[in-house]
From Swiss-Prot:
PANTHER family according to UniProt: 3-DEOXY-MANNO-OCTULOSONATE CYTIDYLYLTRANSFERASE, 3-DEOXY-MANNO-OCTULOSONATE CYTIDYLYLTRANSFERASE, MITOCHONDRIAL
Keywords recorded for this protein, A-Z: Cytoplasm, Lipopolysaccharide biosynthesis, Nucleotidyltransferase, Transferase
GO terms for biological process, alphabetical: CMP-keto-3-deoxy-D-manno-octulosonic acid biosynthetic process; lipopolysaccharide biosynthetic process
Function: Activates KDO (a required 8-carbon sugar) for incorporation into bacterial lipopolysaccharide in Gram-negative bacteria.
Alphabetical list of InterPro entries matching this protein: Cytidylyl_trans, KdsB, Nucleotide-diphossugar_trans
Domain of life: Bacteria
Pfam families: CTP_transf_3
Organism this protein belongs to: Rhodopseudomonas palustris (strain BisB5)
Family: Belongs to the KdsB family.
Protein name: 3-deoxy-manno-octulosonate cytidylyltransferase
Catalytic activity: 3-deoxy-alpha-D-manno-oct-2-ulosonate + CTP = CMP-3-deoxy-beta-D-manno-octulosonate + diphosphate
């Protein structure tokens, strides 16, 4: 039995308000988006491309030997952007699994990118994602940290029941910090982008709730650490230090 073909897509745009021009910010002489691209390539799990509507991002990626697919500028989410990119790159529909990797994860480890595929070994799973255990009260109560509430299936694997910015679940026991990395079965991505925004998605401002409210199954692999995203100048300096610059 051959392994399903996997495509890693990195959606990127220049519209960040807290950190303008984020994908092209310099880390050791290389744009941040290129660091993410290189880590995805190092995972060695399939073809990798950056999906963008911005010529400057495309030029930077191509200059460093990466693949780019240009998309429309009016997409409401990264999921919609990668869906368009998938259709463009694979009209023959050979790709079975699509990974959505955020372009602001320059410190993500290649093995974490590969780990997101593991929950899809169960054919009942529509979407896979990752989380890491929370170890501080500050992280637990921070609304910018998305928590996943899930039912344990086995060691290091949960079935997601809910995602929230609140402190949850209540009581003793571990809480988990959701990592915004997704692996979709192709049919699941196509269904997801066909659905309208759901009530809880709009309330929590978390698009993965659209899938749960539609009855789709999301399983969550537990990893040992959270790759820190870059949203502020302080985050950028942290990423530079982590990468030795």
């Amino acid at each position: 039995m051959t392994a399903p073909l996997t495509l890693v897509l990195i959606p990127a745009r220049m519209a960040a308000t807290r950190l303008p021009g984020k994908p092209l910010l310099d880390i050791g002489g290389v744009p941040m988006i290129v660091h993410v691209l290189r880590r995805a390539l190092a995972a060695s799990i399939g073809r990798v491309a950056v999906a963008t509507d911005t010529p400057e991002i495309a030029e930077a990626v191509i200059a460093h030997g990466g693949e780019v697919v240009m998309t429309r500028a009016d997409h409401p989410s990264g999921s919609d952007r990668i869906h368009e990119a998938l259709q463009t790159l694979d009209p023959e529909r050979r790709i079975e699994t699509v990974i959505n990797l955020q372009g602001d994860f320059p410190t993500i480890r290649p093995e974490q990118i590969g780990a997101v595929l593991a929950p899809l070994a169960d054919p009942a799973v529509d979407i896979a994602t990752l989380a890491a255990e929370i170890h501080t009260e500050e992280e637990s109560t921070n609304p910018n940290v998305v928590k996943v509430v899930g039912s344990p299936i086995r060691d290091n694997l949960l079935r997601a029941l809910y995602f929230t910015r609140a402190t949850a679940p209540y009581g003793d026991g571990p809480r988990y910090h959701h990592i915004g990395l997704y692996a979709y079965r192709r049919a699941a991505l196509e269904r997801f982008v066909s659905l309208p925004p759901s009530p809880l998605e709009q309330r929590e401002k978390l698009e993965q709730l659209r899938a749960l409210e539609a009855g789709m199954r999301i399983d969550v692999g537990i990893v040992d650490s959270v790759p820190r995203g870059v949203d502020t100048p302080a985050d950028l300096e942290t990423a530079r230090r982590a990468l030795g610059f």
